[in-house]
UniProtKB/Swiss-Prot annotation:
Gene3D superfamilies: Winged helix-like DNA-binding domain superfamily/Winged helix DNA-binding domain. Pfam families: DUF480. It comes from Shewanella baltica (strain OS155 / ATCC BAA-1091). This is UPF0502 protein Sbal_1765. Belongs to the UPF0502 family.
Amino acid sequence: MELTLHEARVIGCLLEKEITTPEQYPLSLNSLTLACNQKTSREPVLELSETQVQIAVDSLNRKRLISEQSGFGSRVVKYKHRFCNTEFSELQLSPAALAIVCLLLLRGPQTPGELRTRSNRLHEFKDVIEVEDCIRQLMNREKPFLKQLPREAGRRESRYVELFSAASSQLETAQPESASHTVAHVAVSLDAEPLELTKRVTELEQQVAELTQKLDELIASLS
């Protein structure tokens, strides 16, 4: 499966709220929109309209990753995920793995240390080593769920990204573009310096030639 940014946010919110606020789960469209637009525990912070969330929900419904539920005597439709750990889902995750996947869907690439710090409401990890063990299990599958990103300058730990959405492919394309832009910028800077010097030398040569001509004319007039 490959989820869009909005679809990944919807699935992440449903996974999160099922664990952290089970009394409010499943979620109505309004509650789901509020969850998608939270200012905390979300990266990037979005400002989705209910229409945008509904479009994502409808798409997930067609992918059989969401189901609708309405109570007796209530016209409000509520939504629950079929992403994992349901009788309709092929994907079965441990509580630890579910917490990591949920956080990566909601907050993008993160280090094991960040995942441990941010996971306390979803799952209690004993230490970072336990997080790293779980990450390895999610990566060492026939079809991996996570991948490791190159370590960034100034970071002691590498970040990991989930492979359920388009986020990883966007990161892969963004990094070469950034690198090529940097190389191009350096090349232009290096090329620009000799060009400026050449131009300056040409101007000076012209000035010297003009002065020489005027001097010759002055000498000729005096003789």
